[in-house]
Amino acid sequence: MLVGVVYNHPQPLPYGEAKDKISEDAVLEEVSDVQQALRDLGHHVVLLPLKNDIAGFVQKLSSTPLDCVFNICEGAYGCGVHEMNLPALLELLRIPYTGSPPMALGCCLDKATAKRVLLGAGLPTPSFKVVQTRFEPVGPLPYPLIVKPSREDGGRGVSGESVVYDEAALKERIRYVLEKYRQPALVEGFIDGRELNVSLIGNDSPETLAISEVEFTKLPNGFPRILTYDGKWLEKSREYADTPVTCPASVDASLKRRLEEISKKAFQVLGCMGYARIDFRVDVKGEPYIIDVNPNPDISRKAGFAKSAEKSGLTYPQLIQRILNLAINRFSTFKPAEPVRIRKMEEEDVPSVLNLLDSINAFKRMEVAVAREVIEAYLKKPEGGDYSIYVADYLENQAAGYICLGPTPLTEGTYDIYWIAVNPRFQSQGVGKKLLRFAEQHVRSLGGRKIIIETSSKKEYEAARSLYVAHGFKEVARISSFYASGDDKIIYEKNLSN
């Protein structure tokens, strides 16, 4: 499979603490781990970082013949509120993707909205109040309370000062969140007890993995028993050392059953898909309360989710493949809007094919002119000539794609694919794959032994190269700076006898 790994390329943060950049940058480690696992599994991988050039990102995404996107994007422009927009885009482009849909991501990021959904489903979560201004009354919530940004994840904005015991400390912490994070503050009852994490994997009927626990026994007296941002991300900090995570957690059968039941229901009512992690606090009476639902948790090798999977019998590559399979199964209905038929090119197809070539930015005018000459030569002698040209049938009077191939001069059974192009409107719909499969079948029917494709090393041809590799072509030669300085000729080969 050709899998695109989409992630938010680290950007300057528009608000928050300077140290918050550490969690923003951590996505690169996650990308590396997922990419390596996919390659170890035999998949072809294209990295698709989301930077500030959104138009360029969309163009690359829509022009790459992806079988699936592995989505580990957590926002854009350094801001998590855009996390939900990426899967929304993928759905519009009809590209399968891993993880939760837009509504689940948006709902869970806004902690107050998620809590309202949970309460509406009869699930336990601490009492809360969303505070929009410094002077807004909190109401009758009993102390101690915990104050945190209402639309952040990764522990941003959470420190020892987040737990407050009186009105003065409450007002100061609300002021801090409003000014530093530029968003409403979530004030909720603080459950002074155990903190447990339940990881889930699945779609409509998720299963739970081994439960983890954040240990607080090493924290100094007087420090609130919470996992802070420093405890999550600053590996050299005292709080990181004092809050280790144990997996599997020591929980009795009754609590384990209760945690699993609540987690599965929360996963479903919030619309999560693929995988998620749910964080609990357990009070002195043994009652669990949901404090956070993360529909897009860190799945790097060293992260808690992967450790829970390992303790449940899944190796890291198996976990990644499982997540990928869930996405493929979920989006099995994503098909081209209309069936595509491949047939021989005819005279009336010329304007449509030339328009197709003109619409692809990677092709220069000179290249399009050469393609025109080849088409004219073919039409003069469509049978027994040097070229065979086929089109993928029309989409609203535009060819969905075309391919030009022919026997390589002075060889026996070797064929060249000279041109292959897909209408941008039909990219990522399997047209390129269908054209290549057709070409392979055609060459086999003629007794051909192998197919050669020559192409450029330029970035603009990356999608085409990925298509060739995904279809079984192997790079066998490269001529440095053949087309221009820095633009290599890459030669791909596929032996049909294998």
Regions found by a protein language model. Give the residues of each.
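ATP-binding N-terminal substructure of ATP-dependent carboxylate-amine bond-forming enzymes
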Residues: 1-96, 103, 107-109, 132-137, ...
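Active-site nucleotide/adenylate-binding loops and adjacent lid/helix of ATP-dependent enzymes
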Residues: 1-7, 62-63, 105-195, 204-205
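Phosphate-binding site of ATP-dependent enzymes
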Residues: 69, 167-261, 284-289
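ATP-dependent carboxylate activation and anion-phosphoryl transfer catalytic cores
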Residues: 86, 119-122, 250-339
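Conserved catalytic-core motifs of GNAT/GCN5-like acyltransferases
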Residues: 129, 454-457, 469, 474-490
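Acetyl-CoA-dependent GNAT
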Residues: 340, 344-418, 423-425, 436-438, ...
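Conserved acetyl-CoA-binding loop-helix of GNAT-fold acetyltransferases
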Residues: 428-441, 466, 470
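Conserved GNAT acetyl-CoA-binding A-motif
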Residues: 443-456
